[in-house]
């Protein structure tokens, strides 16, 4: 199948997983119930005799109506599965039908997520080893042992082991081990059949194996087989093999390519003999091994397969307890299995990352690359050559799951049975065709796969015909003048995350991985700009993302507002698209959509109708272009610390919006005991109630501070008097009945300041089946939008893994400046570039400076570098700088001695500095790890018993924890007392603590200096355990007999 490149926008489509889920419900679930459920259930008791018949062919589903479902409340609709049952009374011959509710599952929508507990959750795909034959080799007693592992569909497997030292071949199933030749006799295969169908009928090795089976092990193995005959029949009986044999030797075309001819019409006779021949081929080194982790031997598990696997367990459990669940008089179900709990506990079903539209896209295309058994997990972490074009070579998770959780490549297609296909362009006579072809791993190894931009020599004629190609799972250098080959582009080796890095070739791959992760962790900004240096894939990301609204049909826009868009399509149908306004993501960032079309505009299929908060002109833009100096300033740029200017703060270049939601209910016990909201609350002044409306709810658009009231809630109850005479006396004095008033108003906590953006009120239907709160009649939800400015302690990052903590915000007048009076936006230390091999950020700074000077955007093209070879980028940058110098008329813009560097002056004195610095324009963004979320305080709290350190985390009332980059920022700022407390006294000094307590309480001892902390004492014990001794000696002056001062900080 061929497609034009212009119209091809294929990736792991959501429709595959969406249709697979519903195909399981419509087809596979019926087959599963038929296989597991017995056809008849007989219930006999003293009074009635009943016969129960299951009717899985009439299985039907029911989804919640929109009357009960409110999309605003993020309540996911449930799919109810009903099993029709037929009841028959054997005495009276009475027959009636009953629909039995057996399961409830959350609805899985076409965007590859479902709602659980009000939050979006996504299913991560998983690789599973396909059923079939796998060959292995291991060393035992200095001899090679060859064996074939055969995996069946029911997860059973057995091994056929060839041991030439013992001169035998045997079959092993779990703990059973017996001769393979005798096993063939058991299947009805005699010596004549073995010699007839085997290719080694004249070989001495095969005759030796038959002879040893007959002479040495005949009696013992025959008794052993007869003893375990029932177990063998349960595995190899014909009824089981008829079901399993379709996948027993899976995909015989694959095995024909790898190992030879498998007869498709035969059952087991020739196939087992052929496996014997393959083991002998491997022993004689006529064939090479195929790794079990090869992508040919794996398939992708979808959510339909996940439910199918778990339904087997629940259906079997359901059968065992179905007599107790059904009451014969009422015929009602007492217990329903809800799969919501199963989806919450599964580690592959995770909360969707919604920091920005890019993070949501990358999270959906993750892949679990290992099975439940973690054997050989070190080999799985490595990059296999067969993953080229299918899995990203760089993108993976960090930590213990490194190499196990990977991402799909940019352009792939999921084919039948979960097989990955890549697209390649055919090349003939060094000309790339317009059409593309899809190739699997098998097809990929049959043809020659070229990679562009790989030049072996400087001679052009040599590079035209001799190329580096990928063939038969290896890289080769071949002459391909007239041979048919295919081209795999450089961008198709990576996922979307890496393709957003412009100069990825000039960076360390580990830093590229870090830069890709940080782009998905960047916060959408209020004042964002498109970068001067682009890669060309910014618009393609938006077409793949589901966070924007795309047109389903071609039509004319009737009405476009901030709430909804009306479109009339070609069939005169009216389609309404509702926009998300001021919604909260899973990471508390703001989701806000704006319309891109106007009234009367003609829209086409898959055209963008809205834009997100991180989209500008249908292009992903999440940062700002900043003028950067690579140098130092008063030591504030220590290690990776960043110095910012006040201009960045005043112009709000890194200001972001975040959302908090407060949700509460109004309940009741009876008519006289009810909660309500009112403006007349006791013991509160007018100043506190000025932001409330007449109902006692905060007004929309109000600015709220710490201690303000969001909503008033009062509960009035009648007092209980034991004596009615006292109640009458109080009524006669005051003239009113006395009531107990309890104030349950909601106040703003510290650090939660913001502005009320939206208020939602919901009436709770007390008669509804989907009632979520007991004794509640009203639910109120208040959205508070917070604007966070750039502060000291926030983390800034670029696109190349370069990140740092903002350590100081300086005045513009104090910063060094260029000869045209340009002040830098941020100053970054230059020592981190060569040590981390981050040359890409230097190229981006220089090319961005050119784009800033000419007011243009630059797309670096690496495909045209074949003419200039390795000097292409250097020539490009030098020419741009020189032309910029000639156009502006300033000689200082291009220094012939130091190209790309500029002389600067000190902003405080105006004196020209001795050294020159590299100055450029690069894109920076703000990460979600902000200082307001990190800082928390405590006066007292729990400590660990051994190290005497504060516990970790806010949940445990732990102490403040500082990371490596936070320490660098403190060192740059010169916070010596904080550093001493963090580094030296992070663990308490028990002796000094007790001395301080005695001094403050009893005054019976003098206050002494601090000694060694408890954690340092633990380190000393660890050294002693390693037979190392650490001692401290004082140096003395022998002439004056005085101790010399020795200051040591532990």
UniProtKB/Swiss-Prot annotation:
Catalyzed reactions per annotation: RNA(n) + a ribonucleoside 5'-triphosphate = RNA(n+1) + diphosphate
SUPFAM superfamilies noted in UniProt: beta and beta-prime subunits of DNA dependent RNA-polymerase (SSF64484)
Gene3D superfamilies: 2.40.50.100, 2.40.50.150, 3.90.1100.10, DNA-directed RNA polymerase, beta subunit, external 1 domain, DNA-directed RNA polymerase, subunit 2, domain 6, RNA polymerase alpha subunit dimerisation domain, RNA polymerase Rpb2, domain 2
Enzyme class: transferase
Cellular component terms per the entry's GO annotation: apicoplast; DNA-directed RNA polymerase complex; mitochondrion
Predominant localisation class: plastid
Location in the cell: Plastid, Apicoplast
Disulfide feature: none
Family designation: Belongs to the RNA polymerase beta chain family.
The protein's assembly and partners: In plastids the minimal PEP RNA polymerase catalytic core is composed of four subunits: alpha, beta, beta', and beta''. When a (nuclear-encoded) sigma factor is associated with the core the holoenzyme is formed, which can initiate transcription (Potential).
Protein name: DNA-directed RNA polymerase subunit beta
Native organism: Neospora caninum (Coccidian parasite)
Gene name of the encoded protein: rpoB
């Amino acid at each position: 199948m061929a497609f034009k490149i212009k119209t091809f926008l294929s990736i792991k489509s959501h429709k595959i997983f969406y249709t697979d889920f519903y195909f399981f419900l419509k087809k596979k679930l019926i087959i599963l119930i038929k296989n597991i459920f017995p056809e008849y259930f007989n219930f006999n008791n003293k009074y009635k005799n009943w016969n129960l018949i299951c009717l899985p062919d009439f299985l039907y589903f029911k989804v919640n109506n929109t009357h009960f479902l409110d999309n605003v409340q993020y309540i996911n609709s449930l799919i109810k599965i009903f099993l029709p049952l037929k009841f028959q009374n054997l005495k009276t011959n009475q027959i009636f039908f009953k629909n039995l509710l057996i399961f409830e599952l959350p609805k899985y929508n076409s965007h590859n997520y479902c709602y659980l507990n009000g939050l979006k959750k996504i299913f991560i795909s998983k690789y599973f080893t396909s059923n079939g034959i796998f060959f292995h080799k291991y060393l035992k007693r200095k001899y090679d042992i060859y064996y074939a592992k055969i995996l069946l569909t029911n997860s059973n497997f057995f091994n056929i082991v060839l041991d030439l030292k013992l001169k035998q071949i045997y079959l092993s199933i779990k703990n059973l081990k017996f001769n393979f030749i005798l096993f063939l006799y058991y299947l009805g295969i005699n010596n004549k059949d073995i010699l007839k169908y085997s290719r080694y009928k004249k070989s001495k090795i095969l005759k030796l194996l038959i002879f040893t089976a007959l002479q040495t092990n005949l009696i013992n193995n025959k008794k052993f087989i007869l003893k375990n005959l029932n177990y063998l029949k349960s595995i190899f009986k014909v009824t089981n093999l008829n079901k399993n044999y379709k996948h027993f030797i899976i995909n015989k075309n694959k095995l024909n390519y790898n190992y030879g001819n498998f007869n498709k019409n035969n059952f087991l006779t020739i196939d087992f003999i052929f496996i014997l021949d393959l083991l002998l081929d491997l022993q004689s080194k006529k064939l090479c091994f195929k790794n079990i982790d090869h992508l040919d031997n794996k398939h992708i598990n979808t959510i339909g397969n996940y439910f199918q696997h778990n339904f087997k367990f629940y259906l079997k459990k359901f059968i065992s307890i179905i007599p107790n669940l059904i009451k014969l008089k009422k015929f009602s179900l007492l217990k329903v299995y809800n799969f919501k709990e199963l989806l919450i506990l599964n580690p592959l079903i995770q909360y969707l990352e919604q920091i920005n539209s890019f993070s949501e896209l990358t999270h959906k295309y993750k892949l679990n690359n290992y099975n439940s058994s973690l054997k050989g997990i070190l080999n799985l972490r490595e990059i296999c050559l067969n993953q080229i074009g299918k899995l990203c070579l760089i993108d993976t998770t960090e930590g213990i799951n490194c190499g196990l959780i990977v991402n799909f490549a940019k352009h792939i297609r999921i084919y039948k049975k979960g097989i990955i296909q890549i697209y390649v362009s055919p090349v003939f006579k060094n000309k790339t065709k317009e059409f593309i072809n899809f190739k699997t791993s098998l097809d990929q190894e049959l043809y020659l796969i070229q990679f562009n931009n790989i030049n072996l020599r400087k001679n052009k004629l040599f590079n035209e015909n001799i190329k580096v190609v990928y063939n038969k799972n290896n890289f080769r250098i071949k002459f391909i003048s007239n041979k048919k080959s295919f081209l795999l582009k450089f961008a198709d080796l990576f996922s979307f995350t890496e393709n957003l890095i412009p100069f990825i070739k000039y960076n360390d791959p580990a830093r590229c991985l870090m830069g890709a992760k940080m782009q998905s962790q960047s916060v959408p900004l209020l004042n964002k700009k498109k970068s001067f240096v682009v890669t060309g894939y910014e618009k393609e990301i938006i077409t793949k993302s589901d966070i924007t609204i795309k047109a389903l049909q071609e039509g004319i826009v009737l009405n476009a507002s901030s709430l909804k868009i009306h479109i009339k399509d070609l069939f005169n149908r009216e389609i309404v698209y509702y926009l998300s306004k001021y919604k909260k993501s899973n990471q508390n960032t703001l989701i806000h959509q704006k319309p891109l079309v106007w009234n009367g505009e003609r829209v086409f299929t898959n055209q963008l109708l809205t834009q997100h908060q991180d989209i500008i002109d249908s292009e992903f833009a999440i940062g700002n272009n900043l003028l950067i100096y690579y140098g130092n300033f008063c030591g504030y740029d220590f290690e990776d610390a960043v110095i910012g200017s006040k201009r960045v703060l005043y112009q709000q270049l890194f200001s972001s919006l975040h959302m908090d939601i407060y949700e509460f209910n109004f309940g009741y016990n009876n008519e006289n005991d009810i909660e309500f909201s009112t403006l007349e609350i006791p013991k509160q002044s007018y100043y506190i109630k000025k932001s409330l409306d007449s109902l006692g709810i905060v007004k929309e658009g109000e600015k709220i501070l710490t201690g303000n009231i969001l909503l008033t809630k009062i509960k009035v109850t009648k007092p209980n008097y034991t004596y009615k005479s006292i109640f009458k006396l109080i009524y006669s004095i005051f003239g009113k009945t006395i009531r107990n008033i309890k104030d349950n108003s909601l106040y703003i906590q510290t650090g939660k300041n913001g502005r009320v953006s939206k208020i939602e009120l919901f009436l709770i239907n007390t008669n509804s089946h989907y009632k979520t709160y007991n004794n509640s009649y009203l639910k109120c939800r208040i959205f508070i939008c917070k604007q966070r400015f750039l502060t000291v302690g926030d983390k800034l990052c670029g696109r190349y893994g370069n990140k740092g903590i903002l350590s100081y915000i300086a005045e513009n007048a104090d910063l060094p400046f260029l000869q045209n009076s340009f002040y830098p936006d941020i100053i970054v230390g230059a020592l981190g570039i060569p040590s981390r091999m981050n040359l890409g950020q230097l190229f981006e700074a220089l090319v961005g400076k050119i784009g800033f000077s000419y007011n243009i955007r630059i797309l670096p093209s690496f495909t045209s570098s074949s003419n200039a070879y390795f000097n292409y980028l250097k020539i490009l940058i030098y020419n741009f700088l020189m032309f910029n110098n000639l156009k502006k008329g300033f000689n200082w813009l291009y220094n012939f001695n130091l190209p790309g560097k500029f002389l600067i002056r000190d902003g405080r004195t105006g004196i020209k500095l001795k050294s020159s610095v590299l100055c450029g324009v690069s894109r920076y963004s703000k990460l979600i790890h902000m200082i307001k979320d990190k800082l928390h305080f405590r006066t007292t709290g729990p400590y660990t018993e051994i190290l005497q350190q504060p516990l970790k985390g806010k949940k445990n009332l732990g102490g403040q924890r500082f990371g490596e980059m936070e320490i660098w920022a403190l060192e740059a700022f010169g916070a010596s007392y904080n550093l001493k407390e963090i580094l030296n006294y992070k663990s308490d000094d028990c002796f000094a603590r007790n001395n301080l307590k005695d001094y403050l309480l009893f005054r019976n001892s003098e206050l002494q200096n601090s000694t060694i902390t408890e954690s340092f004492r633990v380190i000393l014990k660890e050294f002693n355990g390693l037979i190392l001794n650490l001692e401290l000696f004082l140096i003395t002056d022998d002439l004056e007999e005085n101790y010399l001062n020795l200051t040591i900080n532990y």
